[in-house]
Amino acid sequence: MYIEMIDETNQVSEEIKNQTLDILEFAAQKTGKEDKEMAVTFVTNERSHELNLKYRDTNRPTDVISLEYKPESSLSFDEEDLADDPDLAEVLTEFDAYIGELFISVDKAREQAQEYGHSFEREMGFLAVHGFLHINGYDHYTPQEEKEMFSLQEEILDAYGLKR
């Protein structure tokens, strides 16, 4: 999995960046998404607040914002088109590989780690996996969705070694 990582806060250690890359690659392997691409940006509460207002119409910061990439194009190409134009096939494959981006609030992660009584490392890993599952179509609006998503989330975190 290819992951672009940006630290807008300049507060995230190399260890946390490496853990984030590692746990996302682990989650991708567990969910069969190894060939996908995504972006992760570490932000402040102020930036999280702006993004939450813009994308979710919620006037407060949040821990992780997950923006799932959904191609808006309804273009379709048959196999002959793709065979005639290998560049087109490559571009479409790249678009198909990109699944979305996460914005993780470093401030919120610190607050929540303290509130929940576990490490900052565990909270950052949790937020990365939680966001990853969201951009892969998982949600928790209904009890059944919540059970499915949270079960997989804990399975990934436990298998990786970030148990509660």
From Swiss-Prot:
Zn(2+) binds at H130, H134, H140. Its cofactor is Zn(2+). Its main location: cytoplasm. The keyword Protein biosynthesis does not apply. It is an enzyme of class 3 (hydrolase). InterPro entries: MetalPrtase_cat_dom_sf_prd, YbeY, YbeY_CS. Signal peptide: none annotated. PROSITE patterns: UPF0054. It comes from the Bacteria. GO terms for cellular component: cytoplasm. Gene3D superfamilies: Metalloproteases ('zincins'), catalytic domain. The keyword Cytoplasm applies. Its EC number is 3.1.-.-. Binds 1 zinc ion. GO terms for biological process: rRNA processing. Keywords: Cytoplasm, Endonuclease, Hydrolase, Metal-binding, Nuclease, Ribosome biogenesis, rRNA processing, Zinc. Pfam families: YbeY. GO terms for molecular function: metalloendopeptidase activity; RNA endonuclease activity; zinc ion binding. It is found in: Cytoplasm. Belongs to the endoribonuclease YbeY family. Single strand-specific metallo-endoribonuclease involved in late-stage 70S ribosome quality control and in maturation of the 3' terminus of the 16S rRNA. This is Endoribonuclease YbeY. It comes from Streptococcus mutans serotype c (strain ATCC 700610 / UA159).
